A protein has these predicted regions:
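ATP phosphate-binding glycine-rich loop and adjacent ATP-lid/helix-beta elements
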Residues: 604-606
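A generic beta-sheet turn/junction motif
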Residues: 80, 253, 299-301, 505-509, ...
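Patatin-like phospholipase
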Residues: 1-282, 286-293, 298, 313-314
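C-terminal outer-membrane beta-barrel translocator/porin domains of Gram-negative envelope proteins
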Residues: 286, 292, 305-307, 319-329, ...
Length: 638
């Protein structure tokens, strides 16, 4: 997790979790004042910073690195001047974080107004820094990798690795030339291992151990029995965390300090709760306002202040995401959608945002919403919206459309709500739509339908899944209720309620999802635009996508999948899954008459891959109604 910027999904704010619910890819383009802005590194180093802060929290009282149990120096490089920067004092986690910010891989770290990167560019083997500390002998471990041949340069990481090696060879050789017979040089045989060889960590450790065992003169560096070797950081850790007397924020982001403080749950007057603080750091970073969120404990006159640093994003906080989803049954029936969303963050100190979505294809949509928190804790909010959409609604007989309509609707609404921690949300809304349905398939003399809709609505949501595509733990639930009300302008009065519950379980590489889904229209009114669309993989498999539509439905579902070793099946090392689903349920229009499938079973065999553009599934679906279908689907399925 240290080599990732993403917090645990369960730690991020609920609103940001919902960004996963569409088919847009996670990678995004960033804009600053309307201009495309590229990142300063592949990673911001957020999780790396939190790990260092947590491991070294007990050193916060030490400002002079000579006072550490083992005197220490960190070396970084000023990326603006190329000068070496030697840290002999300051905040230890920040110094270490700057000293390992490999250019291109990690974004530079700002310290005292200077942008710093890994010291590899200026002093890769800082022997002179060690001698300046007054040591008698130095032990040098040279892990410089040999240059790769052209045939071995097969990825962007290989190119970055080779570039770093070329840039550092000169300063490394200059430093190694100062070694004397009293010093010890270890050069482990690392072969082709480089900075990106994370999977080879154990082999690198073993190579270092062999290098030490084979070295001459090691005994000269062994302290005599009873000698003080200087101690170590682990033995200096306190038995309990410091009591926190105050919490302060050093904030350079777009939102008010109170917004950040509202996400920190550390009680005043109690010991530092490190696990909870790490979760809070993930929540703050997950708002997307900051490039780095760190903390330190400031000790002054017997008082301990938790100081949280939040650095605003230098590259901007407005994001564009693109995406594609498609379904194909290999029988000539396919659906596709291409979409984009643009989110403008931090419109005011409370953290307002403006979200716009555009989608073209089988289902078209233009949606824009202004989301305004009403308090610094970001609990209550108001969200007016404008919506225009178009979709196909088919009348199905034996899995074939006999009449197809193209439905278009446009309208606006207002939602009032409350977020429930990071796991859920409650929304109450009013909305008003106008629309029409035109014949797309079938008798062209069939009449078109114009309609008016107006709703009161209530939604209660919960989402604690660890992954939205292939979850291994957590649950999701949604209760939706809406009342079509003629007093607001609707053509008919009816109530509709839908409950969706899905629970994920994990055991080793295996995952199991247990789900129950119910939709009910509490009226005999036949309103086509209010029907539930079902059919397709996981939603009554064997039927084509959206091949079932009804005013009511019940569905129980069990999904199993197993994650397999990626290298067995693809060269991109993408997560690969094999699994199956079992489904049982019913779709109908009325209890006493009209369309009714009766209760029937369905199931599917599937294989899936978590690709860079979303989950990709191939499968075979069958059901007791006598239908079967092959399918390929790019986009969320279960």
């Amino acid at each position: 997790d240290a080599l990732s910027d993403s917090p645990q999904r369960e730690d991020i704010p609920y609103r940001r979790k919902q960004d996963d619910r569409d088919f847009l890819v996670k990678q995004r383009l960033t804009f600053n004042n309307g201009v495309l802005s590229l990142p300063l590194g592949l990673l911001q180093g957020q999780n790396m910073g939190v790990v260092l802060e947590s491991l070294l929290v007990h050193t916060n009282e030490i400002d002079n690195f000579d006072r550490l149990p083992i005197p220490f120096r960190a070396v970084a490089t000023d990326i603006a001047t190329g000068e070496a920067v030697v840290f002999d004092h300051g905040h230890l986690p920040l110094a270490i974080r700057a000293s390992l910010a490999l250019p291109g891989f990690f974004a530079p770290v700002e310290v005292d107004g200077r942008l710093l990167v890994d010291g590899v560019l200026s002093k890769n083997v800082p022997i002179d820094v060690a001698r300046a500390m007054g040591v008698d002998r130095v032990i040098v471990v040279d892990i410089g990798t040999p240059l790769k041949s052209a045939s071995e340069l097969t990825s962007v990481l290989d190119i970055m690795d080779q570039t770093t090696t070329l840039l550092t060879r000169t300063n490394t050789e200059k430093q190694l030339a100062t070694l004397t017979d009293r010093d010890l040089l270890l050069q482990p045989a690392l072969g082709n291992m480089g900075f990106s060889s994370f999977a080879d960590a154990q082999q690198a450790i073993d190579a270092g151990a062999r290098s030490l065992a084979e070295a001459n003169g090691v005994l000269a560096f062994v302290a005599p029995d009873g000698a003080d070797s200087g101690g170590n950081l682990a033995s200096s850790r306190p038995q309990r965390q410091a009591i926190i007397h105050a919490i302060e924020v050093d904030n350079s982001g777009k939102v008010a300090d109170e917004v950040v403080l509202g996400m920190i749950r550390q009680p005043i007057g109690e010991p530092l709760n490190l696990a909870r603080l790490q979760t809070d750091m993930g929540t703050i970073y997950g708002t997307d306002y900051f490039s780095r969120v760190t903390y330190e404990i400031v000790h002054d006159q017997g008082r301990n202040t938790l100081l949280v640093h939040t650095a605003g994003r230098r590259t901007g906080t407005d994001y564009l995401r693109l995406g594609l989803n498609l379904v194909d049954d290999f029988e000539g029936d396919s659906q596709y959608n291409v979409g984009a969303s643009f989110r403008v963050n931090g419109l005011n100190p409370l953290g307002a945002e403006w979200l716009t979505r555009l989608q073209v294809g089988s289902e078209q949509e233009l949606y824009t919403e202004f989301y305004q928190p009403l308090d610094y804790g970001s609990r209550y909010f108001v969200a007016p919206f404008i919506d225009a959409e178009a979709r196909n609604i088919d009348v199905i007989d034996d899995d074939d459309p006999i009449v197809g309509y193209r439905q278009k609707r446009y309208g606006a609404g207002l939602n009032l709500g409350r977020q429930i921690a990071n796991s859920g949300e409650v929304r109450f809304g009013l909305s008003r739509y106008r629309g029409n349905s035109r014949v797309r398939i079938g008798d062209p003399d069939l009449p078109s339908i114009d309609f008016n809709e107006a709703f009161y609505s209530l939604e209660i949501d919960r989402d604690t899944l660890d992954d939205v595509n292939f979850p291994h733990s957590g649950e999701e639930a949604r209760l939706s209720w809406r009342q079509s009300e003629p007093d607001l302008g609707a053509d008919a009065r009816y109530q509709q309620i839908e409950l969706r519950v899905n629970k994920a379980f994990g055991f080793g590489p295996n995952s199991l999802q247990l789900g129950g889904f119910i939709g009910r229209t509490d009226s005999d009114v036949d309103v086509a635009q209010s029907s539930f669309s079902l059919g397709g993989p996981g939603w009554f498999s064997g039927f084509r996508q959206d091949g079932l539509a009804g005013q009511n439905y019940q569905l129980g579902r069990l999904v199993y999948y197993r994650r397999l070793a990626p290298s067995y099946f693809n060269t991109l090392s993408l997560p690969f899954y094999l699994g199956a689903s079992l489904e049982y349920g019913r779709v109908y229009n009325r209890d006493d008459a009209g369309f009714d499938t009766g209760y029937f079973g369905a199931g599917s065999l599937l294989m899936g891959m978590d690709t860079l553009v979303g989950p990709l599934f191939f499968g075979l679906g069958v059901n007791e109604e006598g239908h079967e279908a092959l399918y390929m689907k790019l986009g969320q399925t279960f």
